[in-house]
């Protein structure tokens, strides 16, 4: 029998947990970050084996899960798309049962249906490292970053600008609504959240008092924002839509003019990375050659400004993932709030 409300549970989408449980994970993340900074060991997962399954490329998520597992005393094992046969030579159910017999927890980054089946059949906690619909581990890091900077969550206004129907916009809208954060989605009409996601968020907002806004009007959407948040304009697998997407989203670029439009000198900028803010990458050079664009969702000036918190946010991926794994697998005493 466990004394933890988290023990043995999977995190597939933010709605899997309650408001108080999300708040606990955020505060636990801050605590673990403090322990890390002070050099205090926290081996809550000593002797545990963690499978890291990636069918999509990853830098921050893979690095965060790997370092988090090691800090917790666990052994992480990376399995890329060439190492696993999910649904190809072996059914997801069969693979899940095998992995569940060898590993104590599984991170998976790919299709939502596969993540759900892994959780259903593996018998161990499964953590969603990113699907097309949701990015729950990123949310703990993001709202941890917000709380670090403002000392609170309730009443803070976070404005997401750009592609408003991708996984980041979905997760920010729903999670923010659960936590009492005011979420503004500022995007072209054709790139706004689905009605299903809006309805889910609205249900939570009524409970927590979140005041949300979904609009194509940049000036109205960013006014009074505490946080400006953006993501890449073209998600994985959408490269064929690049030219169309860039032309559509140019007015939604975070730049210093948009920062001024918030009217808030104490605001911050967040980005889950990677960011296309210059041409110092092969991809950036290629885009510049093809379309004459050197900056996309955020200008280099804004990216390097005093308002930017994207690297603090990236570091927090490790601390938040550590909190998620320790809470769901570490047999910790975490009573119901």
UniProtKB/Swiss-Prot annotation:
Keywords: Arginine metabolism, Cytoplasm, Transferase. It comes from the Bacteria. Its main location: cytoplasm. Transmembrane segments: none annotated. Its EC number is 2.1.3.3. It catalyses: carbamoyl phosphate + L-ornithine = L-citrulline + phosphate + H(+). L-ornithine binds at residues 167, 231, 235-236. It is found in: Cytoplasm. Gene3D superfamilies: Aspartate/ornithine carbamoyltransferase. PROSITE patterns: CARBAMOYLTRANSFERASE (PS00097). The keyword Cytoplasm applies. GO terms for molecular function: amino acid binding; ornithine carbamoyltransferase activity. Pathway: Amino-acid degradation; L-arginine degradation via ADI pathway; carbamoyl phosphate from L-arginine: step 2/2. One of its GO terms (biological process) is arginine catabolic process to ornithine. InterPro entries: Asp/Orn_carbamoyltranf_P-bd, Asp/Orn_carbamoylTrfase, Asp/Orn_carbamoylTrfase_sf, Asp_carbamoyltransf_Asp/Orn-bd, Orn/put_carbamltrans, OTCase_ArgI. The keyword Metal-binding does not apply. One of its GO terms (cellular component) is cytoplasm. Reversibly catalyzes the transfer of the carbamoyl group from carbamoyl phosphate (CP) to the N(epsilon) atom of ornithine (ORN) to produce L-citrulline. Belongs to the aspartate/ornithine carbamoyltransferase superfamily. OTCase family. This is Ornithine carbamoyltransferase, catabolic.
């Amino acid at each position: 029998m466990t004394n933890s409300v988290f023990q043995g549970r999977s995190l597939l989408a933010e709605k899997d947990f309650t408001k108080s449980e999300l708040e606990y994970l955020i505060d636990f993340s801050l605590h673990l970050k403090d322990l890390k900074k002070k050099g205090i060991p926290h081996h809550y997962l000593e002797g545990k084996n963690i499978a890291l399954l990636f069918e999509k490329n990853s830098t921050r998520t893979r690095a965060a899960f790997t370092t988090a597992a090691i800090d917790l005393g666990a052994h992480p094992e990376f399995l890329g798309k060439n190492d696993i046969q999910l649904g190809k030579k072996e059914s997801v159910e069969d693979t899940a049962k095998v992995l569940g017999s060898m590993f104590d927890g599984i991170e998976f980054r790919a299709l939502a249906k596969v993540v759900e089946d892994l959780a259903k059949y593996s018998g161990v906690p499964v953590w969603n490292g990113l699907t097309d619909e949701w990015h729950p581990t990123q949310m703990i890091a993001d709202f941890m970053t917000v709380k670090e900077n403002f000392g609170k969550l309730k009443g803070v206004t976070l404005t997401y600008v750009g592609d408003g129907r991708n996984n980041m916009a979905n997760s920010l809208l729903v999670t923010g609504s659960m936590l009492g954060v005011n979420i503004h989605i500022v995007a072209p009409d054709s790139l706004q959240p689905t009605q299903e996601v809006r309805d889910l968020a609205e249900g939570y907002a009524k409970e927590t008092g979140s005041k949300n806004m979904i609009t194509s009007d940049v000036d109205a959407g960013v006014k009074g924002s505490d946080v400006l948040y953006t993501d890449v304009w073209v998600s994985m697998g959408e490269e064929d839509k690049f030219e169309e997407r860039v032309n559509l989203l140019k007015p939604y670029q975070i730049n210093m003019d948009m920062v001024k439009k918030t009217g808030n000198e104490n605001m911050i900028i967040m980005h889950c990375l990677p960011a296309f803010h210059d041409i110092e990458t092969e991809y950036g050079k290629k885009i510049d050659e093809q379309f004459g664009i050197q900056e996309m969702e955020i200008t280099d000036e804004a990216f390097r400004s005093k308002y930017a918190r994207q690297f603090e946010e990236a570091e927090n991926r490790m601390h938040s993932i550590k909190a998620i794994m320790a809470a769901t697998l570490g047999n910790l005493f975490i009573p119901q709030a």
